[in-house]
Amino acid sequence: MTIEALADVVRLHPELALFAAIVFGHFIGKIEIRKVSLGTVVGTLIAGMILGLLFEPEIPDLLKWAFFDLFLFAVGYSAGPQFFASLKREALPQMALAVVVSCTGLAAAIAMVALFRFDPGLSAGLVSGSMTQSAALGSALSAIAAMDVDEATRALLTAHAPLADATTYIFGEVGLILFVTVVAPRLLKVDLRQVAREAEAELQARTDEDDAALWDQAPLSLRTYRLENAELDQRTVHEFERRYAAGRLTVTGIRRGDQLLRDVGADARLALGDIVLVASRRAGVVGAALEVGTEVDDQELLSEPMVRASIVLTRREMAGKTLGELARGAARGLFLDSLHRGESTLPRAMGTRVQRGDVFKLTGSRAAIATAARNLGFIEHDQGRTDLVYLAGGVVVGILFGLLQVRLTGVPLGLGTSGGVLVVGLVAGWLYSRYPVVGHIPEPALRLLSDVGLIVFIAAIGLAAGPHAVQAIHEGGIALFAKLVGAGVVVTLAGPIAGLLLGHYVLKLPPIALLPGIAGAQTTVATLNALKERGGSDVYAIGFTVPFAVSNVLITLWGPVIVACAVALSR
């Protein structure tokens, strides 16, 4: 098949080019140079521009913006609980850090636009690439689409945006990783691994080392033993569990003669000859077996159902407490598999503080799970089912909300449809975490909406920009790329430098909160992963979530702001 014949097929079926851009973009994004890769998003953008240049497929705007709206709603829904939690007094320092970093980045971008006279398209790509926020590219393109210009100019500006984004994105990610993991620790004179060890030691500190009612974190093991140790005769279950607190043993059932006791309470008494069902981590069971008695194979007891559940923390009085405080007297028989806040997995340490909207992945008996749900919030039922009415309705309300405008000195101001969908998504996610009656969207579905929504949008942008990219490169030449790279370096580093100074000297944030906070304020998950790798600990994730949620919103809104500034500066 000749290239002309292939081009004809692609023009008849433009979806071929769309999905091909995603496929080739994945492989382009995987190419590493000294352990640095472009990533799937930028790879797809580049692949889309190349395929667009070769085949010029016509991708409907409806498809592009529909997928982008789904992406924005998913981002807002995920970040909603953390965003509104950042408005609380204890989270204000982290919120202030995010605001300063993102606003400084915007100010630097405006300065670069004024200096180099970038048009609105280049300005949009400068912000989205330098601050590694692809959502800002979409919101800026939405603003460009609404500009009162001829179609040729709009097409050229639309091509300039992804070109500038791809040019500045590389340093936007790599530069921030180097700053946060190498430069900033040297300026602060700290060692990342030592900082992590100290934070872990503080989080693991307990007020009562003998307390048996603490979350277990190891793989669950169920065993049955005949009670033969006379010292344990007539002891309560609580005393038994306290005796073997180091092994985290929990008695979940007892056979006494022909009587089978399930959901045993802490005040129940043991007797010699009882068959006891214990749940624990494997090492704990093995250690206790030497004292308790002979292990027996009681299949009826061992069939005691242990269930897994995801419990969302919604009770106001529980928010702000540590895992140790929650566990004391309330976590008997529960095993904490993982703890999640938005897209981040938190350390399962006794000092980790929880917030409303956090998700506990627990294993335990039905009674223990039910008790935990009453104490913490609610169990996520129908975890594989998405409330499509809530999702679609949220997008509709967001678009309508974004269309609202007010006039300031004759200039129309508004969020735009992209900003409207994002804000409504934030509110929708927050409302569900508080009132989980309707609106459930499971985490896998959110990830799918976010990933597919963004990648399809980026592929469509690249395909549309491809035919105009050559003209943009021809007009700008090497000088344009040099200006973009230089401006990108300034915009990427301006915010983190300001954040480092503010966080260290004014907010007095410790490095364990400051460094991941800067990464979150620049919305760069890759930087958090680099921090965790160099620091050898997941504890850095705690300081990432609040700034990430706040800056996700702010930098997305910077898209139309930078377009408006570029238009104003060009007059």
Swiss-Prot record:
Coiled coil: none annotated. One of its GO terms (molecular function) is monoatomic cation transmembrane transporter activity. Residues 294-378 form the RCK C-terminal domain. It is a multi-pass membrane protein. GO terms for biological process: potassium ion transport. NCBIfam families: YidE_YbjL_dupl (TIGR01625). This is Uncharacterized transporter BB1538.
